[in-house]
């Protein structure tokens, strides 16, 4: 069965975007050096929030996920969307069902923070790859904010890179039982 994956870069102080919602601070770091191309080959479908979709789509370059179905969590029409991109109006569960029907490969929860947190809190995430980038932003969009549960993670590896980036891999334990709502 396809794994649902959480693959994200974060500043050392825990932000995935700066105070303006930008990820420009990641520009000096070439994702290909950290295994991004291999990761993307393992992924058959993607799920992302509306703001993440708009941010990626507004860059003006070729759509980076061509050939892979992308499900955008949105209650509104996406307007001009690349081929293979569709809006999902009923939330993460519906998006995951659609993604599982579309591929036998892994599913990537791209972001943003709300989508990633929702998938984690609802017990959908199987594997987490978190890249700690040697930058401190001071403020911005937190990786996880006000998490409603305690989640046990099983350490599955660490990899460091010459530029100071560190990749942490965790398997999400399914042993915690029902999700603790606060």
Per-region residue spans from a language model:
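Enzymes that bind and transform nitrogen-containing heteroaromatic metabolites
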Residues: 1-182
């Amino acid at each position: 069965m396809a794994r649902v994956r959480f693959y994200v870069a974060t500043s050392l102080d825990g932000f995935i975007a700066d105070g303006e919602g930008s990820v420009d601070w990641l520009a000096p770091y070439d994702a290909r050096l950290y295994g991004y191309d291999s990761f993307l080959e393992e992924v058959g479908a993607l799920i992302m929030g509306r703001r993440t979709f708009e941010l990626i789509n507004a860059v003006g370059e070729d759509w980076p996920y061509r050939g892979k179905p992308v499900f955008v969590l949105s209650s509104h029409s996406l307007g001009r969307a690349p081929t293979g991109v569709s809006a999902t109006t009923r939330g993460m569960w519906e998006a995951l069902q659609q993604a599982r029907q579309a591929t036998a490969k892994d599913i990537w929860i791209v972001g943003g923070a709300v989508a990633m947190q929702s998938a984690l809190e609802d017990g959908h995430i199987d594997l987490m790859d978190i890249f700690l980038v040697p930058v401190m932003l001071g403020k911005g969009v937190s990786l996880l904010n006000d998490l409603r549960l305690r989640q046990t993670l099983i350490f599955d590896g660490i990899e460091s890179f010459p530029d100071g980036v560190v990749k942490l891999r965790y398997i999400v334990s399914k042993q915690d039982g029902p999700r603790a709502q606060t």
